[in-house]
């Protein structure tokens, strides 16, 4: 059933024009993009069902293959859904370019959507200028963080190449528990000493979870 089969007063397009985009529900906004539902459900009911079963956040995390497993979602609709969330991700990234870091919350917000597979542990380095604005970031390792996987020379070589004044370490804990392990503390200590020698300060080490973070600096561990 298509949008044109819905009563004119209830069509998302007409409601958008009449009341503005803010008046539309998430399902109605999604319906404007997908346009047609399934043989048994109109597009608004289809989108309401999608969001009820998966949530907007859940839909954003699904791969193209996983989206196509949902009844009524073929390749074209799966690509439309994926494209919407990818655009949102890129807009969020664009807003963070050259962002000034004033604390661990800024680091947490900057990293949202930048960790490619949150089921694995990733270590990133943020390179900052003299005003604590982000110059760039690089992925360093994937997998459980240990001192044997960390090569200070490579990290600080990259910092020098970026003309960075300081760096911040960031890594995720897939479990969601942001408390640092002994290995996390050891890695932080090694890189702080290396940074002190090169006069490139390690400003912080931030561990991120699902909706929380741990700052070594805030807990006086740096």
Curated annotation (Swiss-Prot):
Keyword Cytoplasm carried by entry? no
One Pfam family cited in the UniProt record for this chain: UPF0758_N
Keywords of the record: Hydrolase, Metal-binding, Metalloprotease, Protease, Zinc
* Superkingdom: Bacteria
User: What does the entry give for GO biological process?
Assistant: proteolysis
Renumbered to this chain, motif JAMM motif spans 171-184
Q: Which residues bind Zn(2+)?
A: 171, 173, 184
Q: Where are the transmembrane segments?
A: none
Please list the residue ranges annotated as the MPN domain: 100-222
GO MF terms listed in the record are: metal ion binding; metallopeptidase activity
Describe the family membership recorded for this protein in Swiss-Prot or TrEMBL. Belongs to the UPF0758 family.
Q: What is this protein called?
A: UPF0758 protein Cpar_0627
